[in-house]
Design a protein with these regions (language model features):
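Bacterial N-terminal signal peptides that target proteins for export
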Residues: 1-8
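Bacterial N-terminal signal peptides
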Residues: 9-18
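Sec/Tat signal peptide C-region and signal peptidase I cleavage site
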Residues: 20-24
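Mature N-terminal segment immediately following signal peptide/propeptide cleavage
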Residues: 26-61, 65-66
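Peripheral, non-catalytic segments that deliver or gate enzyme domains
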Residues: 38-40, 61-66, 83-89, 95-390, ...
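Beta-propeller domains
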Residues: 56-82
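Cap/lid segment of the alpha/beta-hydrolase catalytic domain
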Residues: 364-493, 497-498, 503, 525, ...
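Active-site-proximal cap/loop segments of hydrolase catalytic domains
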Residues: 446-675
């Protein structure tokens, strides 16, 4: 494997629906938004492959940049990059430890380019200096130090051609020109392309061998639509003799499979009846899997290698919280370990495997140490048709004195819906949960059908169910919370981004009496126009979208998508709505928000619309995220009666524009006047 850590990224109870909601204890301090959503102090620590350097992301003049320090002297850190607009959020070390490579886009357009910075000299250069191009890393190896493989879609925006990138000269050499409509490529540790994948007409995939940069005429593996979200190759061992798969074929949950490349024989390495195998730790020298992750209610690392088992046992004995190994040297003598206590900010440590010592490197948000952060409670909720919905509940501080995961009296609640929809909510520190709980709300995040991590049947149960059974799962979660005494039926808001934004619009339009208000962030309102405006580089996944959502190329599909689109039932919306949108969003075009705002305006239905001209699918710049959340918490306070930090001057450093409805959000018009 060419990555040190492979990411694959009962309801009985007393009904108190009529009880008056109780808010958080008044003596609980209000945590300032800046402390929760401002820049972290340090994050994303990495060790260079040779172990001589430490790196991390930290603010420089208010923008997240990369810092480096000698591993022996972390206090001698210096900034390596000097980004002034977009924060750097993804980076990695070159195999020779001489450069740090990072990707960034412009204004949230997701046209990510690759940059390299010399660690000693500090010289930075664009390694893929193209316009309207999105780079992919195809191969990076601990065996080949002087180059990597990248995919670049500057020839045809739909498909990536594979190039070899010389890390010293920056020269790009074509390796495989993708004229066969292949969705992706797989390289081994010698940076030889060994596999290619292509979409099938049923929404599944087929996998081809590649020999001498020529793709075989016939596939060697087939994956149907049912397995398409849960089956893919995961990487080779260093000797190239074993190919690992995450594979749900012949089972429900995805197992970790080892395939003998020469014979094709497959061996089950790990499987779990309740959850997919969600990740693996591979030895940086051999590429062999040494531990795997299972994430049902919580993420659990299960060791295979006895030495790694001893390491994980030691770490568990010394650290309290969710433990993740985030970086390993090539010699595998040093690790960076992150621990998430949930009720405190994440801390990173340098772990010396031989000496069995832990050295504290940093706390991601030291300003939150000692803050009134609260526990997250995993719960299982039954849907009306018998599915188990793994969910996470956070309660306001002071409302659960016995710690049983239920408040002593009902409190207002925010149903926080994840995006994707092919993603999931998980256990761990969650800034939005903590923020809303601090303001006096219970927060419930539910993995509705179509969420990933719980097997292919659970995903497929969401096919063609946007706004219907997927929405029913959210309604069932609210009913569970009411029945459990968590909240009362008239004090529930719905909020989310991307699919969660769609769910918010659907909640207010399809079930107009269910929610007291809604906060939609970059959510689509018209599923037909959503599918017509997806980015060109999503071409390979388009058929799967059509099979799982509805086909906009057929009359029947168009009718289904129209029926499930909140835009066409906007006149049913009765409750307050706040919409946030990035103007450069390549996934959910700004028109998705604009058209429902226009429809509501035409019917004189109140809506507040906040747009950020320098953002895309979400708000990457902390100034903008804080500004929107300032509006949101005051909006929710009016709707649900919780606490709020006044908007104040939160909009001043942001690019927030409010084309419509400032008068419907408390304090917004005044904040705009001061901007």
């Amino acid at each position: 494997m060419n990555a040190k850590t492979l990411l694959l990224a009962a309801c009985a109870g007393l009904t108190v629906a009529g009880a008056a909601p109780v808010l958080a204890q008044p003596d609980v301090p209000l945590i300032p938004r800046q402390k929760i959503f401002g820049n972290p102090t340090q994050v994303a620590g990495r060790l260079s492959p040779d172990g001589k350097w430490l790196s991390w992301i930290a603010p420089r003049d208010g923008v997240l940049n990369i810092f480096v320090a000698p591993a022996a002297d972390p206090k001698a850190a210096r900034p390596l990059t000097a980004e002034t607009k977009r924060p750097i959020r993804q980076y990695f070390w070159s195999p020779d430890s001489k450069q740090i490579l990072f990707i960034n886009d412009k204004g949230g357009d997701e046209n990510f380019l690759l940059y390299g910075v010399d660690v000693v000299a500090g010289a930075q250069r664009a390694l893929t200096p193209f316009e309207k191009t999105r780079v992919q890393v195809v191969g990076i190896s601990s065996e080949v130090k002087d180059r990597i493989l990248v995919g670049v879609n500057n020839r045809d925006a739909r498909w990536h051609d594979v190039h070899s990138l010389d890390l010293k000269t920056g020269k790009l050499t074509p390796v495989l020109i993708n004229t066969g409509d292949y969705a992706g490529f797989l390289a081994d540790e010698q940076l030889v392309i060994r596999g290619a994948t292509k979409s099938r007409s049923d929404g599944g995939s087929e996998f081809y061998r590649v020999v001498n940069n020529k793709v075989d005429a016939q596939p060697f593996e087939q994956v149907t639509l049912e397995d398409s979200q849960t089956t893919s190759p995961a990487g080779f061992t260093t000797d190239g003799k074993t190919l690992y798969w995450i594979d749900s074929r012949g089972r429900d949950t995805a197992a970790l499979i080892a395939q003998n490349v020469a014979t094709g024989a497959k061996t089950i390495v790990a499987e779990n009846a309740r959850a997919d195998i969600g990740g693996a730790m591979a030895n940086p020298k051999t590429g062999r899997v040494e531990a795997y992750a299972v994430n049902y209610l919580k993420n659990e690392w299960v060791p295979i290698d006895p030495r790694v088992k001893a390491d994980l046992d030691f770490l568990k004995s010394k650290l309290t919280g969710e433990i993740n190994v985030t970086s390993r040297t090539d010699a595998d003598d040093k690790w960076i370990v992150a621990v998430d206590p949930v009720t405190a900010p994440t801390t990173a440590y340098l772990y010396d495997r031989k000496a069995k010592t832990l050295t504290k490197l940093y706390v991601t948000r030291p300003e939150l140490e000692g803050a009134p952060l609260v526990a997250m409670h995993p719960v299982e909720i039954k849907s009306r048709d018998g599915l188990t919905l793994v969910s996470y509940l956070t309660l306001p501080p002071g409302t659960d004195p016995d710690g049983d995961g239920r408040p002593n009296k009902a409190v207002p609640m925010v149903l926080l819906v994840h995006g994707g929809p092919w993603g999931r909510d998980a256990y761990g520190y969650n800034s939005t949960h903590q923020w809303l709980a601090n303001r006096g709300y219970a927060v419930l995040s539910t993995n509705f059908r179509a969420s990933t991590g719980f097997g292919k049947k659970f995903i497929s149960a969401g096919d063609l169910q946007w706004g219907t059974k997927m929405h029913d799962d959210l309604l069932d979660a609210v009913d569970w919370a009411v029945a459990q005494g968590v909240t009362s039926a008239d004090k529930v808001a719905i909020m989310g981004g991307s699919y969660g934004g769609y769910a918010t619009l659907a909640g207010l339009a399809f079930t107009p009496e269910k929610f007291a208000c809604g906060v939609d962030i970059v959510g689509p309102s018209n599923l037909n126009t959503l599918l017509k405006t997806i980015p060109p580089y999503w071409e390979a996944g388009k058929v799967q979208f059509y099979k799982r959502m509805g086909d906009p190329t057929t009359p029947e599909g168009q009718a289904l998508l129209r029926e499930r689109s909140p835009l066409f039932r906007a006149d049913q919306i009765r409750r307050p709505l706040l919409i946030g949108q990035g103007a450069n969003d390549p996934r959910v075009n700004v028109a998705e928000s604009q058209q429902i705002v226009d429809a509501l305006k035409a019917k004189n239905i109140p809506v507040t619309y906040v747009v950020f001209p320098d953002e895309g699918h979400g708000f990457a710049r902390p100034q903008n995220n804080i500004a929107f959340n300032a509006v949101a918490e005051n909006f929710l306070a009016k709707c649900l009666g919780g606490r709020a930090e006044p908007i104040g001057d939160a909009l001043k450093p942001s690019t927030a524009q409010v084309p419509h409805g400032a008068e419907f959000a408390p304090g917004l018009a005044e904040a705009l006047a001061r901007k």
